[in-house]
Amino acid sequence: MITLAIPSKGRLKEQALEVLAKAGLAISLPGDERKYHARVEGLDNVEIAFLSASEIAGEIGQGAVDLGITGEDLVRENLADWEARAEIAARLGFGHADVVVAVPEIWLDVDTMADLDDVAADFRQRHGRRLRIATKYWRLTQQFFSQKHGIQVYRIVESLGATEGAPAAGLADVIVDITTTGSTLRANHLKVLGDGVVLKSQACLVASKKARTAGDEATLRDIVTKMAAAVG
C-alpha cells in the first residue's frame, strides 16, 4: 500500500487535486470533510491522507507516508539531513514563495549579505550584543548565514507571531521570512537584500526513501512519472 499525503485545506489542496486529476489520478473525496482519508479511483493500493503541509514534511521524514505534496521550504527546514530521508520527485509549479533576508529600509547602506556581515561585526561593538534575526526558519537561516556567507556573529530569536513586525516592535534587527509578493515586507518598511533569497520554494511531490516492496516501489514510480508529465 502506498500512502500519498496532500494538503488538507485551502488553495494548496485545490491545486494539488488539480495536478493529480491532470495526471489521471482522480481522487474519490469523502462525503464528510472531517474525514482525512480518500482513495484514488482505480488504484486499490493507493491511499490518500489529508494533512497540513508542515505535517506532511514530518511524516515523509519519518517514513509514515510514501509520497507527499508540500512546500520545499518545509522539507528543507523540518527534516535534518533531509536528502538522506527524502527526495524531491517533481516540482509542481504552484505554491511559489521565496524565503528571504529582509532588513529595515532605513539601512540605506545595507544592500547585500556582505554589507550585513559588516553590520553584524559592528553591532557587537556599538550595541554590546549580537545582531538579532527573527525567523521561523532556524535551519535554513543558519545554513544561509553561517555556511554560505560566513556570517557568524548573530542570534536567532524565535518568531511567535508575524515575523515581519519584529523589527518595528524592537524584537529583532533583521528577519528571514517567506513571501510571495513582498507587499507585507514593504508595508512594514523592510527590504529584501539583493542576494538575500535563501530559497525559491514551491509545492513539490516528495518521496520518502523508506524501504518498501518492489510492487509498492513500482506503484510509487508510476505516480511520480504521471505527475511529472502532468506539470511538464
Swiss-Prot record:
SUPFAM superfamilies in UniProt: Periplasmic binding protein-like II
Location in the cell: Cytoplasm
Keywords assigned by UniProt, alphabetized: Amino-acid biosynthesis, ATP-binding, Cytoplasm, Glycosyltransferase, Histidine biosynthesis, Nucleotide-binding, Transferase
The enzyme's E.C. designation: 2.4.2.17
Metabolic or biological pathway, per its Swiss-Prot or TrEMBL entry: Amino-acid biosynthesis; L-histidine biosynthesis; L-histidine from 5-phospho-alpha-D-ribose 1-diphosphate: step 1/9
Key word Nucleotide-binding present: yes
Subcellular location, principal: cytoplasm
GO CC, alphabetical: cytoplasm
Function summary: Catalyzes the condensation of ATP and 5-phosphoribose 1-diphosphate to form N'-(5'-phosphoribosyl)-ATP (PR-ATP). Has a crucial role in the pathway because the rate of histidine biosynthesis seems to be controlled primarily by regulation of HisG enzymatic activity.
Sequence similarity: Belongs to the ATP phosphoribosyltransferase family. Short subfamily.
Name listed for the protein in its UniProt record: ATP phosphoribosyltransferase
Originating gene: hisG
